[in-house]
Amino acid sequence: MQKGMTLVELLIGLAIISIALNFAVPLWKTDSPKTILAKEQHRLYLFLRQIQARAENSSEVWFLLINRNLATQQWCLTAQVKNNQTCDCLNPINCPKEVYAHFYYPYFPNKTMIQSHHIYPKEITRFDGIRNTIVTRCFILQAENERTLFLFFNVGSIRVKTNQFDSACN
């Protein structure tokens, strides 16, 4: 008799392994606050860089506005061309088309929150597309006890510092 496995034995073994993995992977893939914050931080950073590039290409001043509703745990960002009327990302219907508004809505809206002294209708910062500068400000993105500090510098740079926060941003 030859040593080896039949096709039926191999298929039964694969079925057992796939059933075991089916139960193990969802438990392993649950998002921790650190993972949630890292994903949200990455998406938000890409949005900010996109708006910065848009401001540079348009040679205009763009506002960045943060809005949040603590009662419903909602928050969002609006980027728009400088205008007397500012857009509210929690109520985008009233936003005029001439401001070319771009909205950022969080991937984890109920698990993350944003903190800043400059909440809608005040802008958090301005991207100057002519000079490639940004008004120096900061805000904090938080998921439970994990925090990330977003810093805007007047030389046009955006920095992200994980698990650090500036007392001026609280």
Curated annotation (Swiss-Prot):
Superkingdom field: Bacteria
Disulfide-bonded cysteines: none
Pfam family, any one: N_methyl
Chief place where the protein resides: membrane
Keywords for the protein's UniProt record, in alphabetical order: Membrane, Transmembrane, Transmembrane helix
UniProt membrane topology term: Single-pass membrane protein
InterPro entries according to UniProt: N_methyl_site (IPR012902), Pilin-like (IPR045584)
UniProt keyword annotation of Membrane present: yes
Subcellular location as annotated: Membrane
Listed transmembrane segments: 7-27
GO CC terms, sorted: membrane
Keyword Membrane: yes
Protein name: Uncharacterized protein HI_0938
Organism of this sequence: Haemophilus influenzae (strain ATCC 51907 / DSM 11121 / KW20 / Rd)
